């Protein structure tokens, strides 16, 4: 209570003198401290506030911070470790990062700045308790500064207390601490702007963890064999708890961080250097350290990933085990169930969980971190079906709850999609995709397209579109065309329509045989540099078949949905997106004019000429430029005929 009075009504200098006096009392009265120490941490933490600490300077210039930390240090040394640990866990689990900042008065700020200036030159000998890491800490977001300072002190406090708890079963107290940390992370992860800080202090806590050896009073009367068994069991359980905490933190603290593991791999494939601005080196470095630490705890990442892949496949295969799976009604229902099953499975698994299992999302993230750390794949090969099931499992749950939205995880599963399409022969990939159930293929392509269109970073979006394009190239021709057509017809997002229409244009122009054909011709020319009378004549080859062939039905289908698009764009309430889609259609028709039906092109040309004249919108000018090009081609063809 007196803490509250001092903290609310006294000046900074008076608070510093009070804390110094309190520290002296704690040091002089260890017996009393052991009795009442559990009640002090909450009051001490209240001195960590923006009215007491200037968040814009390093903590080494704050005597108040030093005094509070020394008080915690004294509590850790002479307080009752079990009672103090219980208090610390309660404080950690209830600590919140509040996103709204409260402004301090000018008088308080001036008082605070004067105190910092007056004492800055006299505190060198007082700061031994402040480590260099926290002493020079300045939060990226000032809202997080005070909560981060509190959580740092509590972590250090708990770490010291765990070294003093006298018990045969230290895992009991470690479990209590890890549970509190997990609750803190779960509660505050959305407010964390600086994942590196919490990752670092959890890493330090885990790697520095060292339980006290039980005293003779606890071991007396227990045989050596029993003690060894207790020790071995405890050691194994402590490793599980630390691994569980580490993998959980990797999974949750990185959920708002882009990761970019897929971009790193893609740039490597393209023989391009990754832009340093795209990579958060400090976060990647701590991720690499986590990977090393987790694997040092007898966690076999390769086995865990393989198990995760098998489990992911079984989640979706279970849909077909329904006795009604062959009925038409169920086939319609299954298209919706494929989006829901991952979320339902996750909820059921959490409810039924009895053993300590590693966070599966964290396992997937660490499997991708293995590549960024070592430059090699944890699994040298992964089949495309497994990668697709993994992608669906890790992305669809976010449709039903935002707690499963995880950017780093999405980057990791896209990375495995890239691996599956680059480390396996094209023939095997095509066969596997052909055997994939239709409802899985559709849901996968729709999720990948939706996530791509929602991506805010243009470079990341380009990488994702390239991945989608590659997968559509590898899909059966009818599957790819049907997906693109259905997207153009039914998808409510214009950005998605523009993306797939660009892909369709490329797939109707480009051919998988073209590259191989060019290489073959070049090789023949090298072997036969001269065209002599004895030369073997080269038979003319058929024109290469594009990824998607153009026929009357497909031309008519695209023509129909283009007219639907034009009709929407003619309305007074049209958006810029509507005009951009019209422009994309015009680019499509201009690019394919040599392959398209002349009569259909004439109708398109006439519709644009009549409906999209005028000025004021820049897209109209580009639409008419494309239409003029189309008109010139039509006129030329009519003259030739």
From Swiss-Prot:
Q: Report which gene this protein is encoded by.
A: YBP2
**Which keywords label this protein?**
Cytoplasm, Stress response
Q: What does this protein do?
A: Involved in oxidative stress response and redox homeostasis. Required for hydrogen peroxide-induced activation of YAP1. Acts in a parallele pathway to YBP1.
**What's the protein here called?**
YAP1-binding protein 2
In the record, the note on similarity to other proteins reads: Belongs to the YBP1 family.
**Keyword Cytoplasm annotated:** yes
Return the InterPro entries for the record. YAP-bd/ALF4/Glomulin (IPR013877), YBP1/2 (IPR040347)
Q: What else is known?
A: Present with 3900 molecules/cell in log phase SD medium.
Describe what happens without this gene.
Increases sensitivity to H(2)O(2) and decreases activation of YAP1-dependent gene expression.
Q: Does the keyword NADP apply?
A: no
Query: Which Gene Ontology BP terms does the record give?
Result: cellular response to oxidative stress; mitotic spindle organization
Q: Name one GO cellular component term.
A: cytoplasm
Please state where this protein is localized: Cytoplasm
């Amino acid at each position: 209570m007196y803490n509250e009075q001092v903290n609310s009504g006294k000046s900074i200098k008076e608070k510093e003198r009070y804390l110094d006096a309190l520290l002296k009392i704690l040091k002089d009265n260890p017996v009393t401290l052991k009795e009442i120490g559990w009640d002090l941490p909450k009051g001490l933490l209240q001195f960590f506030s923006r009215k007491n600490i200037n968040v814009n300077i390093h903590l080494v210039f704050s005597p108040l911070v030093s005094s509070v930390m020394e008080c915690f240090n004294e509590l850790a040394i002479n307080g009752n470790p079990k009672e103090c640990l219980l208090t610390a866990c309660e404080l950690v689990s209830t600590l919140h990062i509040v996103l709204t900042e409260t402004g301090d008065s000018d008088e308080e700020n001036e008082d605070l700045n004067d105190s910092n200036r007056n004492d800055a030159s006299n505190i060198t000998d007082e700061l031994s308790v402040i480590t260099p890491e926290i002493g020079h800490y300045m939060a990226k977001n000032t809202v997080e500064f005070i909560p981060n300072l509190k959580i740092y002190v509590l972590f250090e406090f708990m770490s010291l207390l765990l070294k003093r708890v006298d018990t045969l079963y230290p895992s009991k107290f470690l479990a209590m601490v890890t549970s509190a940390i997990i609750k803190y992370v779960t509660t505050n992860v959305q407010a964390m702007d600086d994942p590196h800080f919490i990752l670092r202090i959890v890493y330090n806590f885990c790697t520095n963890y060292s339980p006290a050896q039980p005293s003779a009073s606890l071991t007396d009367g227990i045989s050596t064999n029993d003690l060894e068994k207790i020790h071995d069991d405890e050691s194994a359980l402590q490793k599980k708890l630390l691994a569980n905490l580490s993998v959980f933190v990797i999974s949750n603290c990185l959920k708002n961080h882009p990761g970019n593991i897929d971009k790193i791999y893609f740039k490597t494939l393209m023989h391009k250097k990754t832009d340093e601005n795209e990579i958060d080196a400090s976060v990647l470095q701590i991720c690499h350290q986590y990977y090393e630490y987790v694997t040092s705890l007898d966690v076999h990442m390769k086995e865990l990933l393989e198990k995760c892949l098998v489990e992911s496949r079984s989640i979706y295969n279970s849909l077909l085990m329904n006795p009604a799976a062959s009925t038409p009604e169920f086939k319609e229902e299954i298209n919706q169930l494929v989006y829901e099953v991952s979320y339902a499975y996750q909820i059921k698994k959490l409810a039924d969980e009895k053993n300590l299992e590693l966070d599966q999302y964290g396992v997937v993230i660490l499997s991708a971190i293995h590549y960024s750390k070592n430059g090699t794949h944890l699994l040298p090969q992964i089949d495309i079906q497994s990668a697709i099931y993994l992608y669906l499992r890790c992305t669809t749950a976010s449709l039903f709850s935002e707690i499963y939205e995880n950017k780093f995880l999405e980057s990791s599963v896209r990375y495995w999609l890239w691996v599956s399409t680059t480390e396996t022969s094209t023939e095997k990939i095509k066969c596997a995709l052909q055997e994939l159930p239709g409802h899985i293929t559709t849901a996968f392509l729709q999720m990948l397209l939706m996530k791509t269109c929602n991506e805010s970073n243009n470079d990341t979006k380009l990488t994702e579109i390239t991945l989608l394009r590659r997968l559509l190239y590898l899909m059966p021709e009818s599957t790819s065309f049907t997906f693109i057509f259905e997207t153009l017809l039914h998808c409510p997002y214009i950005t998605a329509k523009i993306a797939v229409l660009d892909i369709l244009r490329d797939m109707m122009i480009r051919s998988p045989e073209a590259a191989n054909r060019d290489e073959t011709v070049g090789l023949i020319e090298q072997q036969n540099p001269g065209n002599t009378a004895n030369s073997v004549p080269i038979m003319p080859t058929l024109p290469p078949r594009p990824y998607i062939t153009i026929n009357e039905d497909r031309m008519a289908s695209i023509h129909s949905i283009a007219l639907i698009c034009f009709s929407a764009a003619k309305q007074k309430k049209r958006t810029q997106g509507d005009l951009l889609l019209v422009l994309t259609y015009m680019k499509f028709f201009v690019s394919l004019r040599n392959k398209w039906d002349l009569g259909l092109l004439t109708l398109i040309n006439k519709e644009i000429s009549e409906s999209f004249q005028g000025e004021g919108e820049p897209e109209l000018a580009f639409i008419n430029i494309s239409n003029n090009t189309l008109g010139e081609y039509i006129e030329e063809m009519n003259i030739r005929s």
